[in-house]
């Protein structure tokens, strides 16, 4: 399998999980570095510059939430949270703090491997875009969107988006004015098929994060609108 030696940082206080993931991910071609707590994770992140972080929530010294917050201050690196079975609050909190996806413990290593592949592919390969913008720069009111460079500027100032946030925006602007259902968004952006029964609040949280970064008034959005009973749409205010 050709992966070009992407580097994964696995952060978990359980040594058995670290060893299993290090072995499995190394076998399929990734370079793996590990950390046993949040403080060590931040140190290793600065030293190793990984391409993706797998991050447990409950850890000593600094929990996964704290690590996620610190990483998001300086990086848009893909983050997958490991959360406890049935603990919906953990999942939502992690997403609100900037995680891109989550996997519920106990998990199948194959499931995590699939999520890693999907997240790296969708955040680092613009050719997978579902948009019809043909790589052009878009000016939408006070927003400038550079499709090729995957960058967004608001009133001339660059806004930091995670890879998944940009992919979500890219999908919405591909058919401006047309609503996308949450199921459509989950499939197009995250690669989740309907039979997976993924909590659709993953979409809601990412929409909320996008609004907080792009809208002039996030509580009364003009761009990313809710299509009641359906999902969300992007409205071109330049028209």
UniProtKB/Swiss-Prot annotation:
GO terms for cellular component: cyanelle; cytosol; protein-DNA complex. It is found in: Plastid, Cyanelle. Residues 76-94, 135-236 bind DNA. Pfam families: Response_reg, Trans_reg_C. One of its GO terms (biological process) is regulation of DNA-templated transcription. GO terms for molecular function: phosphorelay response regulator activity; transcription cis-regulatory region binding. The keyword Ligase does not apply. It comes from the Eukaryota. PANTHER family: OMPR SUBFAMILY (PTHR48111:SF65), REGULATOR OF RPOS (PTHR48111). Probable promoter-specific protein mediating the interaction between DNA and RNA polymerase. Keywords: Cyanelle, DNA-binding, Phosphoprotein, Plastid, Transcription, Transcription regulation, Two-component regulatory system. It comes from Cyanophora paradoxa. The modification 4-aspartylphosphate is found at residue 56. Residues 7-120 form the Response regulatory domain. This is Probable transcriptional regulator ycf27. SUPFAM superfamilies: CheY-like.
